[in-house]
From Swiss-Prot:
Region forming the signal peptide: none
CC annotations in GO: cytoplasm
Cofactor: Mg(2+)
Pathway(s) the chain acts in: Amino-acid biosynthesis; L-histidine biosynthesis; L-histidine from 5-phospho-alpha-D-ribose 1-diphosphate: step 1/9
Organism name: Ignicoccus hospitalis (strain KIN4/I / DSM 18386 / JCM 14125)
Protein name: ATP phosphoribosyltransferase
Main location: cytoplasm
Amino acid sequence: MRFVIPSKGRLKDATLELLERAGIRPSYLDSRALIVPSNKPNLDLVFARPEDIPWIVESGAAEVGITGHDYVLESGRDVAEILDLNYGRSKLVLAVPRDSGIKRPEELPKGFRIATKFINIATDYFEKKGLDVKIVKVSGSAEVMPGIGAADGIIDVMSTGTTLKLHGLTPIDVILSSSARLIVRKDLLDDPRVETIKLMLESVLRASKKKLVMMNVPDEALDDVLKVLPAMSGPTISKVKSEKPMWEVIAAVDEDEIADIIVKLKNAGAKDILVLNVERLIP
């Protein structure tokens, strides 16, 4: 089985980190090696440009892949997005020079030149708006084009907006929001190998939002402590061998709520509270 992942750009490092946490590691890393065995039997990692990954998966050269939602849409390839991986978040925006005076797409004059590598998305966008612009294809940094007179505006990926600001550009419309996605050939949607890959990644994503809270609770405080815990399916409770009646309580808690919950647990009578990272979470 082949798993194609980004070889460069904003998605590469985050993808390798996610795979590592899911227990999938390349046998070695070499920028010259584009097909690398993994530590999993019969699973090879293929490194490719993010924009090429949709057609690599569709063609059957790889069964699954990771790339950006924007690249999937731009490619027009017949693949299925089966998991939002919650990293590489960005927006595809229409941007113009700050001093142009243009505030809305409808204000673009006829023949306005738009530099972008997202030709298909841009064409569809302007056709739906009924705007007569000229789309200029670029393969590198679109944001420099208005500054050198090669274009009047751009459609490009924006993460923080710093690069646009640096080049004197301002966004006037958000075309779409994007993030990294796990994609698969549609005829493999029910393939057990694909389900295994999805489950491995999904368990890590779920775990990243949770903390495991363990505590000892005196018998008389148990009811009050249980009222505090918003566990997924109820906390795990077991009797502790001690001089006074005591319970061990374990629960998975949302990371964003952990600080408030610890205070409430302490006030409710919980003792010896431990907060642990969760590596994987499978509901």
